[in-house]
Amino acid sequence: MNKITTRSPLEPEYQPLGKPHHALQACVDFEQALLHNNKGNCHPKEESLKPVRPHDLGKKEGQKGDGLRAHAPLAATSQPGRKEVGLKPQHNHQNNHDFNLSPLAEGATNRAHLYQQDSRFDDRVESIINALMPLAPFLEGVTCETGTSSESPCEPSGHDELFVQQSPIDSAQPVQLNSKPTVQPLNPAADGAEVIVWSVGRETPASIAKNQRDSRQKRLAEEPLALHQKALPEICPPAVSATPDDHLVARWCATPVTEVAEKSARFPYKATVQSEQLDMTELADRSQHLTDGVDSSKDTIEPPRPEKLLLPREETLPEMYSLSFTAPVVTPGDHLLATMRATRLASVSEQLIQLAQRLAVELELRGGSSQVTQLHLNLPELGAIMVRIAEIPGKLHVELIASREALRILAQGSYDLLERLQRIEPTQLDFQASDDSEQESRQKRHVYEEWEAEE
């Protein structure tokens, strides 16, 4: 059974006075009878009939709007052919006069008005509910909130609630109920906004799964076909097309394998992204539909693999590389560079630091007609050595000044260095003149023999 909850956020709240309704009604009847009997003691003053406003209640004597006025009947504003639900009129006096009441009588009249106002509101809500009850079969599975209806239907439940919100209605105007409720959008800033909220049904796991399945089928059905493909060809087996989701299987089978391969080859990134976005459940359903009822003995077409689509085929290589090109020439220097190992910068810097620690080099350049450069070395094994380099027109004179032991070691080293230099370029060497001509000829002969042997 539906639970009915009524609330009126804009009307003043009515708090009961602690007495039951029948006791309060008895007091009101007694006070009304007392006022009716004392009618002759008052001085009547005829005025136009005005309805009682909520802000006029509870005012003291001497203020503006003192006293209570009788309510005007509502029958004058009714329309024919419609069921009228409005405010019940107050007890009309015979002469429709105003009375100056005492505080006790005024409080009793206020309580009577509040009680009648609450009863009128209950009658109004009850009439609205009775009018909406014939529409209950049509509202089954519909959820309407703030003037809008949800797209996804839901199943009715036994614990549903019906919430009806009504704005306050002026007591001077009658309330008319139409055949269909008028639902207007809720505007918090506007006073008197009317909102009817229906909440029928509750979403269950079965309904959620059904909604997801329907949305997925709708999305697949709205996918556009290829430009050159007007309809789906019948290439699927009958056992597959007889499944519940036959349109899914038909769309999966209708796409030719060659077309898939061409699209994947032209747009590999797009094909990869689309394949990642496919739902795993859809892939499982499609594979199950394709395998059901298919004879494994027949030849089946396998979809191309991604690596085969991305890599060029052997027969397409000449077309891709139609322009002729020459292979790069490999020189002996390239082989030499390939055999060399790259030295680390840290090792070179360490070697330079060690050499600077072992050598003490001083350069001295003197000016004059003959430029002489002196190089002072302090070696741990040879000791102090001075090298003088003099530039003679057309020649370069180098002189070593050191101890005998140092000179002997240097002479041995110079001889080894001279032999290495002679092998590289013998024509650019000049030997010192000596008394032994045989030794000179022997040195020259030795140099030329080695050079000819290498050639």
From Swiss-Prot:
Keywords of this entry: Cytoplasm, Plasmid, Virulence
Gene Ontology CC: cytoplasm
Basic and acidic residues biased stretches: 43-69, 439-449
Family classification: Belongs to the SpaN family.
CDD domains in the cross-refs: T3SS_YscP_C
Residue ranges, annotated region (Disordered): 38-82, 430-455
Role noted for this protein: Component of the yop secretion machinery.
Gene symbol of the encoding locus: yscP
Protein name: Yop proteins translocation protein P
Compartments where located: Cytoplasm
Pfam families attached to this UniProt entry: Flg_hook
